[in-house]
Amino acid sequence: MRQAPHRLIDICDPTEAYSAARFREDALREVELIRDAGRLPLLVGGTMLYFRALERGLSPLPSADPDVRRELEREAQELGWQTLHSRLAQVDPQAARRIHPNDPQRIQRALEVYRLTGMPMSEWFARLVDADRLPYRLVKLVLAPGDRDVLGARIADRFHAMLEQGFLEEVKALRERPGLGPDQPSMRSVGYRQAWAYLDGRLTRDEMIERAIIATRQYAKRQLTWLRSESGAERFDALSPTLLNKVLKWLDGISCLHQTDL
């Protein structure tokens, strides 16, 4: 990250909610600024739903309804979010496959959309409006590891490195923040959720580490599934020792990269 300027990192307070719609606005603004400076933006990530929103635009999903949300929260308190996830699987199997059973924010939103409209959220996403597509040509590269065992080991190494670099101290400091609790979207993300439970005394250190690593591996699996369905993308084995040469050769072979390309 020291070798090139990065945008849209550390732009929100942990108490703030962040959406795909807001990301699209922020990303389009940064793309224009980079192009105005005569540079080529590289979009790197990440959360595939956000990338798809940037590329294709957003369907006009209904706004949040406080009454429906309160109803869903009451049901979750009585039955548990995993039961609500099972209900989601009945009305929107595609969304249920994409959303983890321990992700109450997205389970709630998907069920809310269905209850408000009678239409599954996945169908809303399928109706993304072409008129709002990204007004550039995208050159898409997918870098995915060919060996899942290596990926799993690197995920474990990464979390251990995070702990060594003060991750728990970061979460302890966040716990002192007013208005920030374990139900905030930022604190339900992978790693933070398990660390918070450990600091609450609900998990041992070993349990925290194991669950955080498992959750990260599950997240990586979902990302790889999404990447396999990404159309118009060139795929490379991220573990190949000749990866750089292969990518550069492929880029050299792309003809007529216009000024409107990304």
Regions found by a protein language model. Name each.
Residues M1-L262:
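Phosphate/pyrophosphate-binding catalytic cores of soluble transferases and nucleic-acid-acting enzymes
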